């Protein structure tokens, strides 16, 4: 069993020079930005060896359960609960089946939230002009309205330890993973459609 508490204070600050701030540098412009966040978390994880070496029964070499929970509180948006449940079952010493379900959460970075607007002139290829490279004025910046990225994850698999000569190991396995992401956080690059 593991139990823990975590506390984090984070801040970010990027102060632009006066020429960049006034858009006086050709081909570039800048801005200043800053942001901060405090976060606390509590977590517990429990591994339960249901059947093992001391209480083995026919058809079950080992059986184990796992349960975990994490609760986080953020100063700049809501709280989050993230559970995890897993099972491992080995009918023999060499064959193992496993499965896990987990809710996951990723907060927006301070950079993605608070980055100031900047202007640049990247070279883009315009398909309407025969893929000719041209410079276009683009503006980019943070978004203080971003929501956290959340996901539901399921994994399952089976592995088999192949009998081999002494000091040589070979394990074969097959796994299945499914990740359902919501509100995925990503930067959009400059492009022409």
Regions found by a protein language model. Give the residues of each.
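Outer-membrane beta-barrel translocator domains and adjoining extracellular loop/strand segments
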Residues: 13-20, 57-59, 77-83, 111-115, ...
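Extracellular loop and loop/strand-boundary signature of outer-membrane beta-barrel proteins
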Residues: 26-34, 68-73, 141-144
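Residues on the lipid-exposed face of transmembrane beta-strands in outer-membrane beta-barrel proteins
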Residues: 1, 42-48, 85-89, 99, ...
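Outer-membrane beta-barrel signature, preferentially recognizing the C-terminal barrel domain
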Residues: 108-173
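Short loop/turn motifs that connect adjacent beta-strands in outer-membrane beta-barrel proteins
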Residues: 1, 51-63, 94, 163-170
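Transmembrane beta-strands of outer-membrane beta-barrel pores
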Residues: 5-13, 50, 69-75, 101-107, ...
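Residues that define the transmembrane beta-barrel architecture of outer-membrane proteins
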Residues: 36-42, 79-83, 140, 150-154
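Outer membrane beta-barrel strand-and-loop segments of large Gram-negative receptors
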Residues: 147, 173-193
């Amino acid at each position: 069993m593991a139990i823990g508490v975590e506390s984090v204070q984070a801040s970010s600050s990027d102060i632009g020079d006066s020429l960049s701030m006034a858009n006086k540098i050709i081909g570039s412009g800048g801005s200043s930005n800053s942001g901060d966040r405090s976060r606390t978390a509590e977590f517990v994880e429990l591994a339960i060896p249901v059947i093992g070496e001391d209480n083995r029964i026919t058809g079950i070499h080992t059986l184990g359960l796992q349960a975990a929970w994490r609760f986080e509180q953020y100063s700049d948006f809501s709280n989050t609960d993230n559970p995890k449940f897993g099972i491992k079952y080995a009918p023999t010493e060499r064959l193992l089946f496993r499965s896990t379900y987990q809710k996951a959460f990723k907060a927006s970075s301070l950079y993605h939230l608070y980055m100031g607007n900047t202007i640049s002139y990247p070279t883009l290829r315009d398909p309407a002009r025969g893929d000719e490279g041209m410079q276009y004025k683009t503006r980019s910046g943070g978004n203080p309205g971003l929501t956290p990225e959340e996901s539901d994850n399921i994994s399952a698999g089976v592995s088999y330890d192949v009998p081999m000569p002494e000091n040589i190991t070979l394990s074969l396995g097959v796994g299945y993973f499914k990740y359902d992401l919501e509100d995925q956080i990503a930067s959009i690059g400059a492009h022409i459609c």
